[in-house]
């Protein structure tokens, strides 16, 4: 009854108006599952490859008809008849069928759509919420949201080099209260920026994208917004950034155009450390470029005891690369993006490896998103404790937050919000 009987795909649009793949997997029982695949703007060079058509006369070359054809042709031919409850077998069949290291034959976008839709179909067949099907009876931790409220870098047309400035409502007692705090801070920030004559248009992930004098000014605006909303920076709301340093790393140096600085790896680390000493900044993602392995090691040694050092481009959700990082002392946390690796099974393998090594995990969206909220369920399924899914506007971001509200309601008293644990770990609010 849980046998896959059909696999269908279509080309839809993501939050940037670019094509992406949506897949539907149907079972003999009549149950089905649907999944849409996200896409990134700042990408790691070793990510699994999303297949694009390259026809400049159609969607400027970004069409995904080839990936759709692969799903409905070769992939469907090979997985129809398989049991949707055997996720590992389905994903291994996809991997073997593609036969490449970076999934560039069938396309990671084609493969991931099938993988996630299969999991949804299986959950629907059993009659379980997706988070519980994926994680089991102990899935109960509601994640701390990393809310991106000021955008820069590749996500916004402004003069900020750091790609994301985020707030983390660690002092909230529940996820729903954390979401309320974030929304209030977001609206207060908008008012503060507008009062000073700044444009309040938003970037790809829903954060504001003002032209500011410096990165320091961005931090100061956020601190003011937290206080204006009636909260205490540090004990109630911590800060996080995604530097996306690979985007401004050239010839072995970090070129900060907004600051008019060219820094060595050590100088870049010192520049970031200065922010952690003056603001309640507890998490830094991609503070070093993916190719600056020695810089990553130095940063981890200097800051790893007091700051969450998150690897995104450097690890690309790949268990083999993560294993090397663990062995060589690179980072203490990993960002998890499903489409960087291309199947659900490989994603879960990476998370297990990270947790086994004592690394924290942050489940993440991409800058090109859809209304699909799979990652909200995944964050709870894995008890990850943290989720990064954008700002407090744009429905593609809010879809994930709203799903977490539903999950919190479903868990009722059994649900645990991770914020107080993070606050305790980082000593926030201590004298």
Swiss-Prot record:
- SMART domains referenced in this protein's UniProt entry, alphabetically: Enolase_C, Enolase_N
Q: How is the cofactor bound?
A: Binds a second Mg(2+) ion via substrate during catalysis.
Pfam families named in the record:
Enolase_C, Enolase_N
Task: Provide the GO biological process annotations.
Answer: glycolytic process
User: What's a GO cellular component annotated to this UniProt protein?
Assistant: cell surface
Of which family is this protein a member? Belongs to the enolase family.
Q: What is known about what this protein does?
A: Catalyzes the reversible conversion of 2-phosphoglycerate (2-PG) into phosphoenolpyruvate (PEP). It is essential for the degradation of carbohydrates via glycolysis.
Under what name is this protein listed?
A: Enolase
The gene name reads: eno
């Amino acid at each position: 009854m849980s046998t896959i009987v059909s696999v269908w795909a279509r080309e839809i649009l993501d939050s940037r108006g670019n094509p992406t793949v949506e897949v539907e997997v149907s079972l003999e029982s009549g149950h089905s599952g649907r999944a849409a695949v996200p896409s990134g703007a700042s990408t790691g060079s070793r990510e699994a490859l999303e297949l694009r058509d390259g026809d400049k006369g159609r969607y400027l070359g970004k069409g995904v008809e080839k990936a759709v054809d692969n799903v409905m042709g070769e992939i469907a031919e090979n997985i129809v008849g398989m049991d949707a409850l055997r996720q590992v077998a389905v994903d291994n069949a996809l991997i073997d069928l593609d036969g490449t290291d970076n999934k560039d034959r069938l396309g990671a976008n084609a493969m991931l759509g099938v993988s996630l839709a299969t999991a949804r179909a299986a959950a629907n067949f059993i009659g379980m919420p997706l988070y519980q099907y994926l994680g089991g009876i102990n899935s109960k931790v509601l994640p701390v949201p990393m809310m991106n409220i000021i955008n820069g870098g590749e996500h916004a047309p402004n003069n900020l080099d750091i790609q994301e400035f985020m707030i983390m409502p660690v002092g909230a007692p529940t996820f729903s209260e954390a979401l309320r705090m974030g929304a209030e801070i977001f609206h207060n920030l908008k008012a503060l920026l507008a009062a000073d004559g700044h444009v309040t248009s938003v970037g790809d992930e829903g954060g504001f994208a003002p032209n500011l004098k410096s990165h320091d000014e961005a931090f100061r605006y956020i601190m003011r917004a937290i206080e204006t909303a009636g909260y205490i920076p540090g004990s109630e709301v911590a800060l996080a950034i995604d530097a996306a340093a690979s985007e401004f790393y050239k010839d072995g140096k970090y070129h900060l155009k907004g600051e008019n600085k060219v820094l060595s790896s050590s100088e870049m680390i010192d520049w970031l450390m200065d922010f952690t000493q003056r603001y309640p900044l507890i998490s830094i993602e991609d503070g070093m470029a993916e190719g600056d392995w020695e810089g990553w090691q130095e940063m981890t040694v200097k800051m790893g005891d007091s700051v969450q050092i998150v690897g995104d481009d450097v690890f690309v959700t790949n268990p083999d690369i993560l294993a090397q990082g663990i062995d060589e002392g690179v980072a203490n946390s990993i960002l998890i993006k499903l489409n960087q690796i291309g199947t659900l099974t490989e994603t879960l393998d990476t998370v297990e490896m990270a947790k086994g090594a004592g690394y924290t995990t942050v489940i993440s969206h991409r800058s090109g998103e859809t209304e699909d909220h799979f990652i909200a369920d995944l964050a709870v399924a894995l008890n990850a404790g943290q989720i990064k899914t954008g700002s407090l506007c744009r429905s593609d971001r809010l879809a994930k937050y709203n799903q977490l509200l539903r999950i919190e309601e479903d868990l009722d008293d059994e649900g645990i919000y991770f914020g107080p644990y993070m606050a305790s770990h980082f000593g926030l609010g201590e004298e």
